[in-house]
């Protein structure tokens, strides 16, 4: 909520069977009418939850923020200005990797541009850094049902339509937790084989 650019809506897809923080979120919704909360009746996974959020969104642009991550206060303003000034439809930024205490342990730099062939070699795109035009998402181009790498699959599909542009400024923080799906080496390996076999 603490962004210098304030013309946005927040769509929270609650996909956790543990309801420990749902009341807090609903209280925030009462205070700020820009917030919409959708609680899934059953766990459908991150990819399908994001698709659901995108489908009910109203804006021209879509940005993502996972629950463990956080944005720099100027992220939306700087990134949207960059996209409008350069007439591009997909952008991402550098980001800091932090531990459970919030300490920066490394910085991931964003390359200036990524094309499909580059993306197959290495995905340097942090999900919570991405802003894209909603028109890029449709029934044949959306998040798949994978436990990990679902964002990688979508970026591959989009990179066949347009180049992906990076901003080498850290505008987000990604929290690395040892028990998170994004940190699960074996699950990432399995899903990685599935992705590469398909593309």
Language model segments and positions:
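Conserved donor NDP-sugar-binding/catalytic core segment of glycosyltransferases
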Residues: 74-105
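Conserved nucleotide-sugar donor-binding catalytic segment
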Residues: 107, 111-188, 195
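The conserved acidic donor/metal-binding loop of glycosyltransferases
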Residues: 66-70, 94
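Conserved short acidic donor-positioning loop in nucleotide-sugar-dependent glycosyltransferases
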Residues: 13-17, 44, 67
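Acidic donor-diphosphate engagement hotspot in glycosyltransferases and nucleotidyltransferases
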Residues: 21-22, 50, 71-76, 101-102
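Short aromatic/hydrophobic "clamp" motif used to bind/position activated sugar donors
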Residues: 62
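Glycine-rich, basic loop-to-helix element that forms the pyrophosphate-binding segment
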Residues: 40-57
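Acidic donor-binding segment of Leloir-type glycosyltransferases
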Residues: 1-39
